[in-house]
């Protein structure tokens, strides 16, 4: 029988509900419990798939092809459970489903209202997403008091009553600011945040007090007194130098013991030795490299959250401090390749649209010609093919149809718009995949023996997650291969190019998939680990 921990946030946004929730989940998992996590987003978009990276940050793709909130990436990095489309839903998705049922007549002519129809659908999805887990942590996006969050808060209020206090609890994250001039932390914002919760029928069972200073015992006692929360359940969570310390911080204050006792669960003690090893490797590196990351969303690094974390994981695996030099690809267009000088390797991640693409192509050329280790991901592979066609084959008009529909050499094109030898457009079956023209979710990939990518994975067949509309044009592929482009990975049916490499280069790998979505701090990822090793070799050679 599943127990539920509902997680809310107060005072301000960006307190780290996802990290705190995932850290608690990691401790409970370390005690032998089956744990899952859900993220409920109050915005009206159906999913984040079409949202601007500058506003929303990264779109995290699940194994089954759902485009979800970046917090699901945190969940998968902290616990072993694989997230699915059932682990994330939005207001837009809820209303879409309810309205579809209304149009079908499923409500038998009833007046459709927020209560009970919207709240019932929210509760149904929470229960479905929890599945057969021992404990499900359910994070409500936004901040208590936001008008968008009200149906979700009402739904969890109802669900707490329905399942009973032995199966549901509320964990509230709140800001406890430190006033430097007074030399003390202030508890009043937390008191008011809890008051707001209680006004809608929600009494927190646990308070996570976020601060840049430790919240001392006297402050915690005061908070407990004014909020009706047990003193042992008022947890201090100050800023740390690595988020992978947080499971240990929460465990040291007995949060998991409180949860287990409250739910009456019989389980083992927590073994956090894996996390201790991660923290030790992170904070005590033996080597150091600098990697230039050339992207187009550098104003909001959350747009590359999983990728940045994956590079950190590769550093942990190699006992190496990885310094990422963030470079806007438009700056390369304006200032040239001097921005890349001194980097031990170059990383070009994915993206959509024309802006900044020429800067990425220039970065690829610099890496190829100067024998600097290169890793391209998604668009990073496509620009590698374009650069090869332009500068090795001499096809100066080579491009992707995403950027130039009239290119004389469209080496990259929409999955549905291949032209055959006569110029007629060929429609591919992939058009019916989830997401229409978007290829989403886990796909098998066959690796060529003896290739760099095969050396990294040590396997003939791998499974990685995709999120793209464009692919290498198979009609021009034979000429590209004849000129020296190495195709080292193909889709399971052999029809699509998944990985390319460069001959006579120490380490040049570009993949169409997104390996960052499956990297974790405890296991790392073979491709990123190999990339950092190549960067180390480059640095030592210099």
UniProtKB/Swiss-Prot annotation:
<feature type="active site" description="Nucleophile; for glutamine hydrolysis">
    <location>
        <position position="378"/>
    </location>
</feature>
<feature type="binding site">
    <location>
        <position position="71"/>
    </location>
    <ligand>
        <name>Mg(2+)</name>
    </ligand>
</feature>
<feature type="binding site">
    <location>
        <position position="402"/>
    </location>
    <ligand>
        <name>L-glutamine</name>
    </ligand>
</feature>
<dbReference type="Pfam" id="PF00117">
    <property type="entry name" value="GATase"/>
</dbReference>
<dbReference type="InterPro" id="IPR027417">
    <property type="entry name" value="P-loop_NTPase"/>
</dbReference>
<dbReference type="InterPro" id="IPR017456">
    <property type="entry name" value="CTP_synthase_N"/>
</dbReference>
<feature type="binding site">
    <location>
        <position position="139"/>
    </location>
    <ligand>
        <name>Mg(2+)</name>
    </ligand>
</feature>
<comment type="function">
    <text>Catalyzes the ATP-dependent amination of UTP to CTP with either L-glutamine or ammonia as the source of nitrogen. Regulates intracellular CTP levels through interactions with the four ribonucleotide triphosphates.</text>
</comment>
<dbReference type="GO" id="GO:0019856">
    <property type="term" value="P:pyrimidine nucleobase biosynthetic process"/>
</dbReference>
<feature type="active site">
    <location>
        <position position="516"/>
    </location>
</feature>
<feature type="region of interest" description="Amidoligase domain">
    <location>
        <begin position="1"/>
        <end position="265"/>
    </location>
</feature>
<feature type="binding site">
    <location>
        <position position="13"/>
    </location>
    <ligand>
        <name>CTP</name>
    </ligand>
</feature>
<protein>
    <recommendedName>
        <fullName>CTP synthase</fullName>
        <ecNumber>6.3.4.2</ecNumber>
    </recommendedName>
</protein>
<dbReference type="GO" id="GO:0005524">
    <property type="term" value="F:ATP binding"/>
</dbReference>
<dbReference type="InterPro" id="IPR033828">
    <property type="entry name" value="GATase1_CTP_Synthase"/>
</dbReference>
<keyword id="KW-0479">Metal-binding</keyword>
<dbReference type="Pfam" id="PF06418">
    <property type="entry name" value="CTP_synth_N"/>
</dbReference>
<keyword id="KW-0436">Ligase</keyword>
<feature type="binding site">
    <location>
        <begin position="379"/>
        <end position="382"/>
    </location>
    <ligand>
        <name>L-glutamine</name>
    </ligand>
</feature>
<feature type="binding site">
    <location>
        <begin position="14"/>
        <end position="19"/>
    </location>
    <ligand>
        <name>ATP</name>
    </ligand>
</feature>
<keyword id="KW-0315">Glutamine amidotransferase</keyword>
<dbReference type="GO" id="GO:0003883">
    <property type="term" value="F:CTP synthase activity"/>
</dbReference>
<keyword id="KW-0460">Magnesium</keyword>
<keyword id="KW-0067">ATP-binding</keyword>
<dbReference type="GO" id="GO:0044210">
    <property type="term" value="P:'de novo' CTP biosynthetic process"/>
</dbReference>
<dbReference type="InterPro" id="IPR029062">
    <property type="entry name" value="Class_I_gatase-like"/>
</dbReference>
<feature type="binding site">
    <location>
        <position position="351"/>
    </location>
    <ligand>
        <name>L-glutamine</name>
    </ligand>
</feature>
<feature type="binding site">
    <location>
        <position position="222"/>
    </location>
    <ligand>
        <name>CTP</name>
    </ligand>
</feature>
<dbReference type="InterPro" id="IPR017926">
    <property type="entry name" value="GATASE"/>
</dbReference>
<feature type="binding site">
    <location>
        <position position="13"/>
    </location>
    <ligand>
        <name>UTP</name>
    </ligand>
</feature>
<comment type="similarity">
    <text>Belongs to the CTP synthase family.</text>
</comment>
<dbReference type="GO" id="GO:0046872">
    <property type="term" value="F:metal ion binding"/>
</dbReference>
<feature type="active site">
    <location>
        <position position="514"/>
    </location>
</feature>
<feature type="binding site">
    <location>
        <begin position="146"/>
        <end position="148"/>
    </location>
    <ligand>
        <name>CTP</name>
    </ligand>
</feature>
<comment type="pathway">
    <text>Pyrimidine metabolism; CTP biosynthesis via de novo pathway; CTP from UDP: step 2/2.</text>
</comment>
<dbReference type="InterPro" id="IPR004468">
    <property type="entry name" value="CTP_synthase"/>
</dbReference>
<feature type="binding site">
    <location>
        <position position="71"/>
    </location>
    <ligand>
        <name>ATP</name>
    </ligand>
</feature>
<dbReference type="GO" id="GO:0005829">
    <property type="term" value="C:cytosol"/>
</dbReference>
<feature type="binding site">
    <location>
        <begin position="186"/>
        <end position="191"/>
    </location>
    <ligand>
        <name>CTP</name>
    </ligand>
</feature>
<dbReference type="GO" id="GO:0042802">
    <property type="term" value="F:identical protein binding"/>
</dbReference>
<comment type="subunit">
    <text>Homotetramer.</text>
</comment>
<feature type="domain" description="Glutamine amidotransferase type-1">
    <location>
        <begin position="290"/>
        <end position="541"/>
    </location>
</feature>
